[in-house]
Amino acid sequence: MKLQNFALGRWIDGSGEGQPLYDASTGDLVATATSNGLDFGEMLEYGRKTGNKNLRKMTFQERGRMLKALAMFLLERKEKYYQISYKTGATKVDSWIDIEGGIGNLFANASLRRKLPDLPYYSEGDAIGLSKGGTFIGHHILVPKEGVAVHINAFNFPVWGMLEKCAVNWLAGMPAIVKPATLTSYLTEVVVRDIVDSNILPAGALQLICGSARSLLEQVNYQDVVTFTGSASTGIALKSSPNILREAVPFNMEADSLNCIILGKDAAPGTPEFDLFVKEVRKEITVKCGQKCTAVRR
């Protein structure tokens, strides 16, 4: 099976044979992936002119209801994702965090609409009088940026990595271009196919790159946003790229971390705190083989 890319509102085959992707447990070939032939500049423009335009005219309430509808749609299809997730080397517990945790992010962000107005913008604070008699006032409003959120994600959360980020930019009124880690992108592609087939999102709200992103970051501008999850060395290299610096593109990096859990002296064996400590440490060193970015390592 050759994975496809979703760009410009349609599914597109990359050129060439592509990178082979294997079942982590059996070594069997699952799919091949390539993004060769994609015009990243055209994808960015499509996101800005079509996806951004469609999302920014929606109110926060409409965007929130959209997220909830999408979450319910994906939740009904979760068993299909579990079966594919096993091929990534994930256990049922690993997959639960990735799949249902990711869908849960859609629900959580959908609920935030209750704190926001039924408007496409948010008024910040109170109006401030700037002249005698109130003939000149100032009032800040928050509006969506006029660009695209580019998400470069890690291999160990092919569903969560996409949904936790996209939920935020969709609620804020921005479209996304998702670049999952190629090794497990076959699971991301299946979820994106269902999202596209649901017709819940407006045109241009989501695009997918299965394969190398090559020159994508060389074409983003100051209206775009980039998020990266992965190693610190790769993240720093991307964040320091000339175009990112020149255009002052917001770059959010979630990279290597070292997390610890501390047991108080009074939490002796037999106390609820000690039992909870053991339970949490066991979970953190076994889920995803202890390789979650938030895993307890000390």
Regions found by a protein language model. Name each.
Residues 27, 63, 173, 206, ...:
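Residue-level signal for inorganic ion chemistry
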Residues 85, 106, 188-191, 219, ...:
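Hydrophobic packing residues within well-ordered alpha-helices of enzyme cores
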Residues 1, 143-149, 172-174, 202-204, ...:
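Short coil/turn connectors at secondary-structure junctions
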